[in-house]
């Protein structure tokens, strides 16, 4: 089963809770820090170890979260981490964080695109792309820029699974495909 399918009910539940008390930013921080902690090999080994008591795992995760966040976890946050551990779902925390952020963006009418370019775009080029995308989608737009030296020119615009490839490489590949079909 895909992680997103398992993570979605958790993300939705947290989002509903955050809607009630306007704690989106607080939850986003907890989820992002928790997801970050799971990048660490030692943390993943600790969680997977059958020799460490669940209570000790929970205490360690909570202590690390509080240390990084520089505050105590509230009752809902502590319970959430406990539920994930009890149900062997702590590993889906990165997926929950991603889905939660998507829910925030949908609610705030924000669309995030990944722009892949062969070079670092100038400020005016970024502004032009954002303006064009805002006009096309009628939403607030945020872009992440990725430089790919293998592109000859142009850009690739990614919106989730959708890809708009207006790179020279794509045009050359398309031309090559057409030529190969005619011979």
From Swiss-Prot:
Keyword Nucleotide-binding set for record: no
Gene3D superfamilies assigned: N-terminal domain of the delta subunit of the F1F0-ATP synthase (1.10.520.20)
An example Gene Ontology CC term for this record: proton-transporting ATP synthase complex
Molecular-function GO terms, alphabetical: proton-transporting ATP synthase activity, rotational mechanism
Main location: membrane
Membrane topology: Peripheral membrane protein
Domain of life: Bacteria
Protein's UniProt keywords contain Phosphoprotein: no
Keywords per UniProt: ATP synthesis, Cell inner membrane, Cell membrane, CF(1), Hydrogen ion transport, Ion transport, Membrane, Transport
Pfam family, one: OSCP
TM region positions: none
Entry-linked NCBIfam families: ATP_synt_delta (TIGR01145), PRK05758.2-2 (NF004402)
Function noted in UniProt: F(1)F(0) ATP synthase produces ATP from ADP in the presence of a proton or sodium gradient. F-type ATPases consist of two structural domains, F(1) containing the extramembraneous catalytic core and F(0) containing the membrane proton channel, linked together by a central stalk and a peripheral stalk. During catalysis, ATP synthesis in the catalytic domain of F(1) is coupled via a rotary mechanism of the central stalk subunits to proton translocation. This protein is part of the stalk that links CF(0) to CF(1). It either transmits conformational changes from CF(0) to CF(1) or is implicated in proton conduction.
Subunit structure: F-type ATPases have 2 components, F(1) - the catalytic core - and F(0) - the membrane proton channel. F(1) has five subunits: alpha(3), beta(3), gamma(1), delta(1), epsilon(1). F(0) has three main subunits: a(1), b(2) and c(10-14). The alpha and beta chains form an alternating ring which encloses part of the gamma chain. F(1) is attached to F(0) by a central stalk formed by the gamma and epsilon chains, while a peripheral stalk is formed by the delta and b chains.
Protein name: ATP synthase subunit delta
Organism of origin: Vesicomyosocius okutanii subsp. Calyptogena okutanii (strain HA)
Gene symbol of the encoding locus: atpH
């Amino acid at each position: 089963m895909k992680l997103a399918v398992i993570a979605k009910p958790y993300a939705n539940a947290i989002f509903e809770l955050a809607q009630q008390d306007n704690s989106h930013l607080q939850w986003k921080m907890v989820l992002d820090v928790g997801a970050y902690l799971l990048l660490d090999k030692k943390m993943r080994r600790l969680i997977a170890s059958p020799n460490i008591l669940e209570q000790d795992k929970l205490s360690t995760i909570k202590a690390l979260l509080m240390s990084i966040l520089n505050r105590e976890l509230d009752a809902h946050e502590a319970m959430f981490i406990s539920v994930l551990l009890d149900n062997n779902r702590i590993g889906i925390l990165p997926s929950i964080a991603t889905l939660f952020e998507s829910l925030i963006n949908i609610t705030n009418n924000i669309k995030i695109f990944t722009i892949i370019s062969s070079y670092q775009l100038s400020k005016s080029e970024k502004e032009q792309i954002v303006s064009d995308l805002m006009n096309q989608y009628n939403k607030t737009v945020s872009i992440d820029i990725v430089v790919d030296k293998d592109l000859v020119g142009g850009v690739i615009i990614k919106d989730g699974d959708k890809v708009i490839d207006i790179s020279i490489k794509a045009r050359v590949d398309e031309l090559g495909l057409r030529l190969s079909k005619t011979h």
